[in-house]
Amino acid sequence: MKAKIQLTTIGLIISLCSIAQSKLDSLINLRTTDKLDGRIQTYYTPGHKDIALEFQTVVTDAIKYYESKNSVQFNVKLAVLDSNQWLKEIYPYGFVFYSNDWLVLNTGMDYEGFINTYGLQTIRQQLDKELKRSKLTADDMIKSIFMVYSIHELGHYFIGRLSKAKSPDKWTNEFSATYFSCEYFYNKRPRDLESFELFCQVDKDHYSPKYSSISDFNEKYAGTGIANYLWYHSNFYFLVKHLYKCYEKEFISNYEKEFPKSSTSRLSTTDITDILDKNCKGQVRQWITELESKTKH
């Protein structure tokens, strides 16, 4: 039976086509990979053991954190592939995704490749300036971005497969996965968020989006364009920061209660905002107002 595969591109879920679980397994098995045993079976392009081990370590630790907290059991596999072995049959190199119990991550890229892949030329000058001011390296920033989004992808697995929640729209589906990731990093590896937050701040403040409304995100999704889509995700990080101050470790359990899988209700953005703001004193509404002001003249 064929199942629709959903891909996330730095948090981006795109339904590309119907690909059976066995086909995804076959595509990965066609690659010549080495393997790391452990709690999470990890397959990687030869020559990239170090980064594969880093991904395996952080994903394993995040799984332990959430299994202990939620009394659930994760069952995922990890593929870490370079540009030559990337699953171009599914999506171009540079994008990480979750599908059918696989977390598919790349082995990284240099700064030039990062800027070009994600269309960040217009904010490069500000990125350079902030990296220099903060005494952080571009390599550290890129690594932190992929680490954070590796757990974001794990969040999609958790919310979709293991939780009692059903995200009411694309916006909630994405920021809830980022919350899942950030809760782990806030509590276990807070320093890893420093250069990630630097990037999100520069992207949020200096990229000029064509689209900035929640309705645009829900309707156009990937169609907003990769740079604009990434800008949305950078903004989602700051929404998560607001929400964490309100909910801390209780957000996901509250999310399950407010947006249960059994629900058949169609919620508007206003409905969702009111629900989230029950404990946040209007901060979510304020965040949306600021977000949507970016394209208002």
Question: Language-model segments: which ranges?
Answer:
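Active-site recognition of the HExxH zinc-binding catalytic motif
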Residues: V148-K164, T178, C182
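Acidic/histidine-rich, surface-exposed loop or edge segments in extracytoplasmic proteins
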Residues: T32-I51
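Post-HExxH zinc-binding segment in Zn-dependent metallohydrolases
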Residues: P168-Y207
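Pan-zinc metallopeptidase signature
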Residues: Y211-H297
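Short pre-active-site segment immediately N-terminal to the catalytic Zn-binding motif
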Residues: D128-Y149, S163-D169
